């Protein structure tokens, strides 16, 4: 999802269904391949021409053995790209083993390779605009941590404290608003501090017990 956003601007909350971006070395623009009902998000949020936003039919959703990548394979064949080298983000979140099998079986004449985090390596070098977003995220993160120190007190329910933290992180500042983060606030307390990634509960904070606070400020999807 993050690399789709980086390459096209697409950022709808649809990553739990099969979707992808195709980058051809000789094409002027990438192709954004999304579910039919999510195409509107691509039209709104990306810079792509309409013809480079390809939507697949709802019949491919939860109708095993049909799969959205059946439509993707057909797209690649229609473009006469099925005998080329095809680089995949093999360790990408939400790229399942079934996605891989559909591509491998559907494109027997292609040379299927691991692109070895190619887009991620490009993303390492940040533009001035990206650094601006990251600095904004840092300010929001500071506000969130300050609110955590204020809200976490003995006798306060963990969920009540987190609701104040969340509000602060999303509200941001008068200059720039916050965005949702890739993780929820982690707030293990007491014996929970022995486990790094526990979230909140309805239990109350207890005087004398330690609490770990992990959160992230976000601006335009850039985290700090």
Language-model regions, residue ranges each:
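Short catalytic-site patches enriched in acidic/histidine residues
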Residues: 4-14, 116-121, 125, 157-224
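A composition/biophysics-driven feature that prefers long, compositionally simple stretches
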Residues: 1-143
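A generic "cationic amphipathic patch" detector
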Residues: 34, 45, 99, 147, ...
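Generic secondary-structure signature for well-ordered alpha-helical cores
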Residues: 77, 108, 136-146, 150-157, ...
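A short, terminal or domain-edge coil/loop segment
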Residues: 45-61, 140-144, 165-177, 207-214
């Amino acid at each position: 999802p993050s690399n789709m956003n980086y390459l096209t601007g697409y950022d709808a909350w649809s990553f739990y269904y099969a979707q992808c971006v195709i980058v051809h070395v000789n094409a002027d623009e990438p192709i954004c391949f999304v579910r039919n009902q999510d195409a509107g998000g691509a039209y709104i949020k990306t810079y792509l021409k309409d013809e480079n936003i390809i939507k697949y039919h709802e019949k491919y959703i939860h109708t095993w053995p049909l799969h959205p990548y059946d439509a993707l394979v057909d797209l690649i064949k229609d473009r006469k790209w099925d005998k080329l080298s095809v680089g995949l983000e093999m360790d990408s979140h939400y790229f399942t083993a079934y996605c891989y099998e559909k591509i491998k079986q559907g494109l027997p004449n292609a040379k299927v390779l691991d692109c070895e985090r190619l887009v991620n390596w490009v993303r390492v070098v940040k533009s001035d605009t990206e650094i601006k977003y990251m600095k904004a995220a840092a300010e929001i993160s500071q506000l969130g941590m300050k609110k955590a120190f204020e809200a976490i007190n003995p006798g306060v329910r963990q969920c009540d404290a987190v609701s104040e933290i969340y509000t602060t992180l999303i509200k941001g500042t008068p200059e720039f608003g916050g965005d949702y983060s890739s993780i929820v606030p982690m707030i293990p307390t007491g014996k929970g501090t022995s486990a790094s990634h526990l979230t909140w509960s309805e239990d109350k904070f207890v005087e004398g017990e330690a609490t770990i606070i992990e959160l992230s400020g976000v601006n335009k999807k850039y985290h700090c």
